[in-house]
Structures are given as C-alpha cells and as structure tokens.
Amino acid sequence: MSDLCPVYAPFFGSIGCAAAIVFTCFGASYGTAKSGVGICATSVTRPDLLVKNVVPVVMAGIIAIYGLVVSVLVSDSLSQKQALYTGFIQLGAGLSVGLSGLAAGFAIGIVGDAGVRGTAQQPRLFVGMILILIFAEVLGLYGLIVALLLNSRASQDVTC
C-alpha cells in the first residue's frame, strides 16, 4: 500500500454510497409524510381531490430514486485496492446527491402540505403548487447531476 492507495480508501467510497441513499430517503420520507398529512386532512372535506393531490407524494418519491442511482453507481465501482482520490470523489458524490435530496424533500413536503390544503379551498392554486414543486424537485436534480459528474471522474488517471 502506498500513500495514494491506503487500506482505508474504500471506506470513504462506502460512506459516500451510504450517504447518497440515506439522506435522499430521509428527504423523500419527510416529503411524503408532510404532504401525506395534508392530503389526509383535506380528503375528509374534499375526497374528489384525492388523486389530484397525490402529486407531491410522487415527486418526493422521485428524490429517493436519485440517491439510489448514485448509490448503485458508487457501490459498483468500489474495490479493495482503491486510490484515496477515488474514495474522496465517491464521498463527495454521495454527499452531493444526498444533501441536495434532503433539502429538496423538505421543500417538497412543506410546499406539498400547504399547497394541498390551499387547493382544497381554492382549486386555482393547484397550478402554482405544481410550479413550486417543480422548482423544489430541481434542487435534487442538481445534486444528481453533480454526483454523476463527480463519479465519472472517480477513476480517471488513478492506478494502485
């Protein structure tokens, strides 16, 4: 083992892999729970809006898929003999998609809850809610793009 390829280098890649799925699932579960509470509360008085108001829950679930994609890509490239550079890049990729997915899930949950409750009283608010949800979803997409770019550089010009 050299200084560039220590025995603990795969640890950082493993943490990146775990961070990608854990943080995005935290965000997705918060978004699902928060907007799900709003859907349940408004469906009592307006059951006709139930299917229409499921959009925030679906969008929150998509956030977890971003983390799954990066986690699978990082875990596929993990190896016992790995450069420290690769481990750090994989950690950065996992944190990138994970933390942006966490923030996006929080935003989707809060906007989804308020939007669903507002739509029950004024149906014209639905379009505005969808637009804001799209902007919140894009936050997670930015993290996915950065993670994919980082992961594509993880094994370039590195040998152990």
Swiss-Prot record:
Keywords, alphabetical: Hydrogen ion transport, Ion transport, Membrane, Transmembrane, Transmembrane helix, Transport, Vacuole
Location(s) in or outside the cell: Vacuole membrane
GO MF term set: proton-transporting ATPase activity, rotational mechanism
Segments on the Cytoplasmic face: 28-53, 112-129
Record-level GO BP terms: endocytosis; intracellular copper ion homeostasis; intracellular iron ion homeostasis; protein targeting to vacuole; vacuolar acidification; vacuole organization
Broad class of the protein's primary localization: membrane
Transmembrane segments: 7-27, 54-74, 91-111, 130-150
Record-level GO cellular component terms: vacuolar proton-transporting V-type ATPase, V0 domain
Membrane topology: Multi-pass membrane protein
Residues in compartment: Lumenal: 1-6, 75-90, 151-160
Residues at the site labelled Essential for proton translocation: 137
Alphabetized InterPro entries for the sequence: ATPase_proteolipid_c-like_dom, ATPase_proteolipid_csu, ATPase_proteolipid_su_C_euk, F/V-ATP_Csub_sf
Keyword Transmembrane: yes
UniProt-listed Gene3D superfamilies: lithium bound rotor ring of v- atpase
Pfam families: ATP-synt_C
Keyword Nucleotidyltransferase: no
Record family assignment: Belongs to the V-ATPase proteolipid subunit family.
Protein purpose: Proton-conducting pore forming subunit of the V0 complex of vacuolar(H+)-ATPase (V-ATPase), a multisubunit enzyme composed of a peripheral complex (V1) that hydrolyzes ATP and a membrane integral complex (V0) that translocates protons. V-ATPase is responsible for acidifying and maintaining the pH of intracellular compartments.
Subunit and partners: V-ATPase is a heteromultimeric enzyme composed of a peripheral catalytic V1 complex (components A to H) attached to an integral membrane V0 proton pore complex (components: a, c, c', c'', d, e, f and VOA1). The decameric c-ring forms the proton-conducting pore, and is composed of eight proteolipid subunits c, one subunit c' and one subunit c''.
Protein name: V-type proton ATPase subunit c
